Design a protein with these regions (language model features):
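Walker A/P-loop phosphate-binding motif and the immediately C-terminal alpha-helix
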Residues: 2-40, 113
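Cytoplasmic membrane-interface segments at the C-terminal ends of transmembrane helices
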Residues: 27-30, 60, 90, 144, ...
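P-loop/Walker-type NTP enzyme "switch/lid" segment
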Residues: 32-114, 196-201
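C-terminal boundary of histidine-terminating zinc-finger modules
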Residues: 57, 198-219
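Conserved GTPase G-domain substructure that encodes guanine base recognition and part of the catalytic core
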Residues: 217-227
Length: 227
């Protein structure tokens, strides 16, 4: 299965969602480790591990003949169940941008790998090309029930297959309002639980994933993989 996680703006929780999905899918899989492709460079911080030191997606894109299998091989093992591929040259201060053709090639590679294992791409606020979304099994837009976030999300929501809603207290809008605004179903709703932020701050998500984070996403993954 190939999932892309993205958002209309930074700071809404996309990397946390992608990291939790990767761990959950990897632990449940009998087909080898899950892969997270980390375009924003924040997945290691969420998992509490070192940054990948080898080549990443940027180097893979820079080689026109590189295969999908070679993309998988540059992943850094985080656990027996999870590998992380960094952005590589894309993460440099003046790093390369991904062209529409690059997005499509990258998407085809992820779709190929997703036939045998689980691939999660953390695109953050980097807006993938339409062809990339179309190649994914699930395109999950991370959003909050906040006017500013929803306003930015509306023009982009047509690319999403569903919404992961981070539910913050104090907002008057609920799940139904978000679905009506974006025209897509809310597939998982994550609470703003202090246990989640504390685990991230302490670098313990990889060792002890908070139930408040895993439980809502596990319901989605069990349906998505048909288990």
């Amino acid at each position: 299965m190939f999932i892309v996680c993205w958002s209309a703006k930074g700071g809404v929780g996309t990397t946390t969602v992608a990291s939790a999905l990767g761990m959950s899918l990897g632990q449940a899989s009998l087909d080898g480790p899950a892969i997270i492709v980390d375009l924003g460079g924040d997945v290691p911080a969420v998992l509490g591990v070192s940054d990948p030191s080898g080549p990443g997606l940027g180097e893979w894109l820079g080689s026109p003949t590189a295969s999908a299998d070679s993309l998988a091989r540059i992943g850094t093992p985080v656990t027996d169940d999870l590998h992380v591929i960094g952005a590589g040259a894309l993460g440099a201060p003046s790093g390369q941008q991904i062209s529409d053709d690059g997005w499509e090639r990258f998407g085809r590679a992820c779709a190929h790998l997703g036939e045998e294992r689980h691939v999660v791409v953390d695109a953050g606020p980097m807006m993938p090309a339409a062809a990339f979304h179309a190649l994914a099994d699930h395109s999950l837009l991370t959003a909050r029930a906040c006017y500013v976030v929803l306003r930015r999300s509306i023009p982009m929501a047509l690319h999403a297959t569903g919404i992961v809603l981070v539910a913050e207290p104090g907002h008057s809008m609920g799940t139904t309002d978000v679905e009506r605004s974006l025209g897509r179903p809310v597939l998982a709703e994550l609470p703003c639980d202090p246990a989640i932020s504390q685990a991230i701050d302490a670098g313990l998500v990889n060792a002890r994933v908070p139930h408040a984070l895993v439980r809502p996403l596990r319901r989605f993954t069990s349906v998505a993989v048909g288990r």
